[in-house]
C-alpha cells in the first residue's frame, strides 16, 4: 500500500501547516459492509498502520475471507500522522450499497469501467 496520506501531510508540513490544524474529508467508498477480501489486504493494512487495526478487520465465516474498513483505516492513518479526530470528516455512504448513486467497481464485477472525481481547494 502506498502512503498517500503520509505524503499529503508531509507536503502540508513542508508548506508550514501543523498536522493538528489540517482538516481532512474522506468521501464515499466501498464500506466495511461490502469490502470482502482475501488475507493479503488485511495484511497490507496491518503493515501500513503498524499493527493498529483493532475494529478495522473482521474475519468472515468463509475460510480466508475478511471484511476491511478502508475509510476507518484511512482515518486511523490520518490520526497517526497527527490530525485531530474532530478535524476528519468521514462519509458513511458505501459505493457498493449505493451503486445507483456512485460507480462501484465491485458492483460491476469487472464489467464497464467507471471513475469518480473529487476536487480539493486550498
Where are these regions (language model features)?
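Active-site microenvironment for binding and transforming phosphate-containing groups
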Residues: 1-122
Amino acid at each position: 500500500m502506498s502512503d498517500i496520506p503520509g505524503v499529503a501531510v508531509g507536503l502540508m508540513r513542508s508548506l508550514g501547516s501543523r498536522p493538528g490544524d489540517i482538516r481532512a474529508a474522506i468521501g464515499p467508498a466501498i464500506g466495511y459492509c461490502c469490502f470482502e477480501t482475501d488475507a493479503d489486504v488485511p495484511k497490507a493494512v496491518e503493515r501500513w498502520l503498524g499493527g493498529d487495526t483493532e475494529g478495522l478487520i473482521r474475519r468472515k465465516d468463509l475460510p480466508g475471507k475478511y471484511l476491511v474498513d478502508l475509510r476507518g483505516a484511512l482515518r486511523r492513518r490520518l490520526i497517526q500522522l497527527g490530525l485531530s479526530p474532530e478535524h476528519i470528516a468521514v462519509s458513511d455512504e458505501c459505493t457498493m450499497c449505493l451503486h445507483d448513486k456512485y460507480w462501484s467497481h465491485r458492483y460491476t464485477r469487472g464489467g464497464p469501467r467507471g471513475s469518480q472525481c473529487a476536487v480539493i481547494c486550498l
